[in-house]
């Protein structure tokens, strides 16, 4: 007996095989550089509310186009820089994340809040933000240090502790900049 996931996968593959290449190509032509509209549009939040989530939350999930066609998603610390409108991450200079980005710079980044609970209601109301865009790897040492300082100030208790970490780790990590191409957010109702 097949499990529910296997049955769904089987049906999806069969549906894709049935779809003619002409229909698929027409769909691609119509949707080039256009983003799908949110189905639950009444729950959509404003761009300013999306930015507020990016400013306040400490962690998100960065999804990359991974090896062998499998998505690769990982939790990351981040900093939204209001001066240039980019989202910055830091990490090792080598590894799976960097290999994926070398092959394809398109990413999806998800951040969500813990949410709130209305009095007398069992459900939570988290807010989620999804950002799509392209990531570049910074190469200018001064810019790398500047963005690392900004990231550090979001997470470390004092500026002195940030400066110490920067001195101790200088040149041992990379900084990634996500240029936002599309951003949406919504207030999720779990019921």
Which residues make up each language-model segment?
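Basic polycationic patches enriched in arginine
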Residues: 2, 11-22
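Short Pro/Gly-enriched beta-strand edge/turn motifs at strand-loop
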Residues: 44-45, 56-61, 158-161
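Helix-adjacent hinge/juxtasegments
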Residues: 97-122
């Amino acid at each position: 007996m097949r499990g529910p996931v296997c049955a769904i996968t089987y049906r999806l593959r069969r549906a894709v095989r049935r779809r003619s290449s002409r229909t698929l190509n027409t769909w691609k032509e119509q949707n080039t550089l256009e983003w799908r509209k949110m189905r639950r549009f009444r729950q959509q939040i404003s761009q300013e509310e999306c930015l507020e989530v990016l400013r306040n939350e400490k962690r998100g999930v960065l999804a990359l186009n991974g090896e062998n066609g499998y998505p690769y998603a990982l939790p990351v610390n981040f900093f939204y820089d209001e001066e240039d409108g980019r989202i910055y991450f830091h990490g090792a200079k080598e590894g799976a994340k960097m290999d994926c980005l070398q092959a394809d710079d398109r990413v999806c980044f998800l951040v969500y809040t813990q949410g709130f609970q209305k009095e007398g209601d069992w459900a939570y109301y988290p807010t989620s933000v999804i950002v799509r865009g392209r990531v570049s790897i910074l190469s200018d040492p001064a810019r790398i240090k500047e963005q690392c300082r900004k990231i550090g100030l979001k997470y470390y208790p004092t500026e002195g502790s940030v400066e110490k970490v920067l001195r101790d780790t200088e040149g041992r990590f990379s900084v990634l900049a996500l240029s936002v191409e599309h951003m949406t957010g919504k207030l999720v109702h779990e019921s």
